[in-house]
């Protein structure tokens, strides 16, 4: 512990975010990092607890507490404080394949479990992580490190999201010959087309992919395995196959008028915007536009917030975000004690921007759509909303949200974006390989394992565990790499 009194001497300081009315003028990342001197003070705030909950990654009441990757947080916090950036990077890379991604998009369960947060502000772990990886790129330490020895084993990874990339990275480090197949035109999966550019600039993904290419990983794009690329061919040519296709089957809503023109899944809205942005800076018009439209976003999660921020950048006339559940409290309640994930109200960047542009929070709680109304041509013109209340089911005893009769109200709507989560993987890939699915439509495996019912076929990420965080996907990718390595070699020395 470099500075035992650091948490007493220094307050938490965050990097500055551009003002909402400025940052909505483009799709660029908008956070300015701290100076090196400021960052070192933040590293000094780490208490190096006897039991560092920040790296625990344990499930508590259905939510993760601490980092699922078990990052060596106290160690690299102390190294940041002492200015040993190279050593900090080496400690960080021991557990995290992609700190350049997690330091931008992770909700930081490590900080929620930080002991400093018991009586004050937690250590700025996420910003320290960001500083470490960016410094490593500046100094060249994050550059290519090809394996010194190669095996004769060939592995196909289907999907280039965080889980597939993590598996490929680890297996390549072991010396295996890895080919990643991606159905889209660009590598990155969820990272590329599911997360807006202002949260994760796509050049950051390309930077890492280029490093992986130089280290020996092969990438094949526009390879839609199960459709234009035969599963049988892969099973014949490769010693092992890893299915990491994500949970890309969006949850729909059953509402009268759902077939109206102007209702889309959030993932299609976000993907089309990013693709057009990268191809033409939105000049080709090949995207779902929210310009001058009254937008309704159904869903209160991160994807819903991304839709709000994206619609505002398009120049929407208004934006409303519907949340079925009640508004969360400002502070932890007695039944949500530390180190559980704090179930408290958070105003994210998209909501901040809506407040700045329209003068009010876009979120309406305990509300859903009762009906969509379309004109004679089939175009959406308005939505009928209805309030919800919590009610206990007399048969099951479970609480659920039910409509409040007589609470209906009409609102104008030209564009509706459904951000209601995902049901699981699209089944055609699993069908092509003959792997079994479980009741949740995820690929079935034994508990804690990654092997499917088909010989030499493994699975990981959201396709395996269901919709989750990027950090969980990386965790799964690293774990499946160990299982594949042991399957091929009889043992594994992967961490």
Identify the meaning behind each predicted range.
Residues 131-149, 207-227, 250-314, 437-453:
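Glycine-rich dinucleotide-binding loop and its adjacent helix/turn
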Residues 5-32, 41-44, 68-82, 89-92, ...:
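Beta1-alpha1 glycine-rich phosphate/pyrophosphate-binding loop at the start
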Residues 13-37, 42-45, 365-367, 373-374, ...:
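C-terminal catalytic lobe of FAD-dependent flavoproteins
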Residues 149, 154-158, 206-255, 370-385, ...:
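Feature captures the FAD/FMN-dependent oxidoreductase FAD-binding
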Residues 304-307, 314, 463-494:
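A conserved FAD-binding loop/helix module that cradles the flavin
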Residues 261-292, 391-467:
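FAD-site-proximal beta/loop scaffold in flavoenzymes
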């Amino acid at each position: 512990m470099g500075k035992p009194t650091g948490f007493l001497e220094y307050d938490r300081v965050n990097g500055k975010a551009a003002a909402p009315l400025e940052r909505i003028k483009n799709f660029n990342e908008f956070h300015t990092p701290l100076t090196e001197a400021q960052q070192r003070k933040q590293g000094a705030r780490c208490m190096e607890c006897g039991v560092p909950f920040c790296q625990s990654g344990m499930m508590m009441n259905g939510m993760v507490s601490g980092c699922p990757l078990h990052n060596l947080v106290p160690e690299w916090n102390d190294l940041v404080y002492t200015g040993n950036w190279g050593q900090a990077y080496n400690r960080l890379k021991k557990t995290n394949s992609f700190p350049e991604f997690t330091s931008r998009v992770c909700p930081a369960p490590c900080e929620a479990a930080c002991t400093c947060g018991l009586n004050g502000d937690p250590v700025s772990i996420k910003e320290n992580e960001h500083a470490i990886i960016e410094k490593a790129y500046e100094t060249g330490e994050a550059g290519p490190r090809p394996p010194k020895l190669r095996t004769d084993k060939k592995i196909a990874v289907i999907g280039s999201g965080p889980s597939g990339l993590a598996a490929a990275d680890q297996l390549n480090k072991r010396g295996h010959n890895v080919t990643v197949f991606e159905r889209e035109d660009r590598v990155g999966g969820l990272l590329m087309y599911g997360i807006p550019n202002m949260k994760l600039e796509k050049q950051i993904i390309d930077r890492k992919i280029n490093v992986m290419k130089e280290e020996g990983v092969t990438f094949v794009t526009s390879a839609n395995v199960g459709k234009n690329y035969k599963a049988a061919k892969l099973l014949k040519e490769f010693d092992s196959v890893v299915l990491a296709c994500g949970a890309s089957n969006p949850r729909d809503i059953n509402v009268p008028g759902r077939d109206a023109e102007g209702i889309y899944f959030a993932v299609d809205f976000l993907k089309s915007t990013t693709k057009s942005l990268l191809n033409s800076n939105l000049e080709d018009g090949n995207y779902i536009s929210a310009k001058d439209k009254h937008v309704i976003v159904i869903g209160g999660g991160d994807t819903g917030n991304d839709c709000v921020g994206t619609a505002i950048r398009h120049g929407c006339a208004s934006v409303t975000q519907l949340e079925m559940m009640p508004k969360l409290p400002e502070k932890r309640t007695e039944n949500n004690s530390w180190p559980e994930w704090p179930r408290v109200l958070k105003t994210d960047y998209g909501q901040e921007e809506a407040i700045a542009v329209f003068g009010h929070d876009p979120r309406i709680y305990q509300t859903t759509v009762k009906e969509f109304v379309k004109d004679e041509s089939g175009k959406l013109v308005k939505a009928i909303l209805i309030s919800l209340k919590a009610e206990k089911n007399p048969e099951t005893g479970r609480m659920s949200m039910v409509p409040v009769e007589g609470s209906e109200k009409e609102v104008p709507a030209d564009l509706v974006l459904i951000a209601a989560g995902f049901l699981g993987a699209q089944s055609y890939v699993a069908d092509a390989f003959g792997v079994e699915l479980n009741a949740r439509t995820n690929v079935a495996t034994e508990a804690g394992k990654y092997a499917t019912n088909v010989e030499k076929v493994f699975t990981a990420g959201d396709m395996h565990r269901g919709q989750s965080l990027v950090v969980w996907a990386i965790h799964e990718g690293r774990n499946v790499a160990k299982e594949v390595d042991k399957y091929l070699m009889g043992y594994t020395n992967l961490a």
